[in-house]
Amino acid sequence: MSLFGTTSGFGTGGTSMFGSTTTDNHNPMKDIEVTSSPDDSIGCLSFSPPTLPGNFLIAGSWANDVRCWEVQDSGQTIPKAQQMHTGPVLDVCWSDDGSKVFTASCDKTAKMWDLNSNQAIQIAQHDAPVKTIHWIKAPNYSCVMTGSWDKTLKFWDTRSSNPMMVLQLPERCYCADVIYPMAVVATAERGLIVYQLENQPSEFRRIESPLKHQHRCVAIFKDKQNKPTGFALGSIEGRVAIHYINPPNPAKDNFTFKCHRSNGTNTSAPQDIYAVNGIAFHPVHGTLATVGSDGRFSFWDKDARTKLKTSEQLDQPVAACGFNHNGNIFAYASSYDWSKGHEFYNPQKKNYIFLRNAAEELKPRNKK
């Protein structure tokens, strides 16, 4: 059966090509607008794995829905299918073969969405909202890892209603990432734990947070041999930490940098400081993107410790981001991120997902 079977798309929005969008402050970078974007804040984005031909994009939103688009080479986006939770969708991920999508929600459940049949079934249950979800593909097991505000990390065989394993967290799970054989989980009260996933998941190390404020997002990075070797951690205080697991020189190799602040990083002038909402590493170059509540995205070279690019300011926060499997497309979501609370939420404000050609802008800075 073909991917998505015979499911119909959603919405009736038009499509646009690379470089043909209008120039206003909702899209100052003139990037491609994804058609039929969600009707409420977009919390998460994820592109399909390289095992699938073509590119498919998943987004979860505070309208309780999960949407899937096909992204064509021209930049045109085609709505393919949609599923619902009974609460906001906080995280999404793909199975390694691209046949399933996993979704985590405030309704305290996680679901598995079979894209061939367009059927979704519950695969996980927590006692509080499920904040993170990741697929783990090990040589001897496959499972889904869910992190929750109930202070647990659970591992699920999708064929069973009971977890394979439950690990207690020191606090509520705020963000997580997985690249086998490594997982990292950041919690409330600045908790930070690295797990090793070989044979079976187990705690590897607790790390004193390099950041002084609440953790917001985390992404694992790889070395030149394509092995996970460290992570980038973002906070609500406009700062990112680059942390290696086993660096030759910790004091020199680990560092933090300021980002998503007004007036650049000139500390002599008063600054508005914004949350870092998302971090994504380029799958080819190893450079990274950050997105923030200031309504900008930035590209960075962590090895050269330099900024490659900062976008113009959008008229609302950039809430999530991600690269496709070969790094040619950068997706970012423009919508309210709740960083200023409910009183600043405007339900009339449209939400957008934009696609940008990322092939050139993420190339690392030449070494002198």
Curated annotation (Swiss-Prot):
Protein name: mRNA export factor
Localization: Cytoplasm; Nucleus; Cytoplasm, Cytoskeleton, Spindle pole
Subunit structure of this chain's protein: Interacts with NUMA1 (via N-terminal end of the coiled-coil domain); this interaction promotes spindle formation in mitosis. Interacts with NUP98. Interacts with MYCBP2. Interacts with USP11.
Originating species: Rattus norvegicus
GO molecular function, one term: ubiquitin binding
Domain of life: Eukaryota
Disordered as annotated region, ranges: 15-34
Cross-referenced Gene3D superfamilies: YVTN repeat-like/Quinoprotein amine dehydrogenase
Known role: Plays a role in mitotic bipolar spindle formation. Binds mRNA. May function in nucleocytoplasmic transport and in directly or indirectly attaching cytoplasmic mRNPs to the cytoskeleton.
InterPro entries: G-protein_beta_WD-40_rep, WD40/YVTN_repeat-like_dom_sf, WD40_repeat_CS, WD40_repeat_dom_sf, WD40_rpt
Entry annotated with the keyword Nuclease: no
One GO cellular component, as annotated: nuclear envelope
SMART domains assigned to the protein according to its UniProt record, in alphabetical order: WD40 (SM00320)
Residue stretches of each WD repeat: 37-79, 84-114, 125-157, 168-206, 215-255, 271-301, 310-346
Keywords: Cell cycle, Cell division, Cytoplasm, Cytoskeleton, Mitosis, Nucleus, Phosphoprotein, Repeat, Transport, WD repeat
Location of Phosphothreonine modifications: 229
